[in-house]
């Protein structure tokens, strides 16, 4: 995939929908493309949240550990969804485990890069506040 395709993908995420293309290009350029195999975890519930992931292709399960210690699937995510945003936006441990159900291609957006962009581009801060309020 080229940079413009990554920008188009980011534009499909509500948080980034109203951000101009130049800022999205910078975000896409600084993101890391990662591939996960079926049953591979992107991250585990309780982990430190250092990044969010945008699903480029594939499907994943969002799982929580119940009080009995069992895994419970609470959501499914697919192309154009993003996961891990709560941990980077709210500075809390991961609230769930995300596990690939199929081969999964993601864009990993690091917390540091994300907040550098928010600092440099105030419009992104406004969009983050809108996302948190919804």
Feature map (PLM): residue ranges:
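Short hydrophobic beta-strand segments that form the core of ligand-binding sensory/regulatory domains
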Residues: 74, 87, 97-99, 105-111
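Helix-loop-beta junctions that constitute the ligand-sensing/allosteric loops
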Residues: 32, 82, 91-97, 103-106
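Regulatory nucleotide-sensing modules
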Residues: 11-63, 68
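Short acidic-glycine-tyrosine-enriched beta hairpin
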Residues: 67-83
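A conserved hydrophobic position in a structured secondary element of the catalytic/binding core
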Residues: 19, 55, 78, 101, ...
